[in-house]
Amino acid sequence: MMVGGAVGGAIGGAVGVVGSLATSLAPHLFQRYRDKKAARAITRAYISGILHMEEFHDHAHWYEGLISVIELDENQAMKMLGAANADMNDFLRPTVIAQLGLLKPDVAGDLMLFLNMHDGLRINLKAMTLGQLNDHTRQQKLKVLKSDLAVWRDAMALGRKLVVRLK
């Protein structure tokens, strides 16, 4: 009988430990699930906003038009009024980057690639619109514009894929 009582006690103890672990882990696991879901939603909305603004401003058309003009006129200025005051700070970016650890590794990697491509385009666009490339040769201007147009298309395609993957 002692063996039966010991086995029963061991089983009862094991059930108690499992029950205790389940009740303490369940809220943590649920919170982690909610955090991951929120990170995907925040990131998806952020990327969607960038895509919407890029498509609204139709930067591809802007690049193509400027390429056509520069092919005809080497001295074409690439300056835009108001560009000097454009704010390059993105107050949402740190929030999105803080969520990286909650995303799948491949999604986090592609997100960083997308953000870096977008940053590079913004920097070059601002430099162009400030007239910082005006002293470059036609070939140099065309190289920058054509490279940026290719990066723009790649970034927009990657962004659209990320939005789907983040659902």
Describe these PLM feature segments.
Residues 1-33:
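Membrane-embedded hydrophobic alpha-helical segments
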Residues 44-167:
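Interfacial alpha-helical end/capping and short helix-turn segments at domain and membrane boundaries
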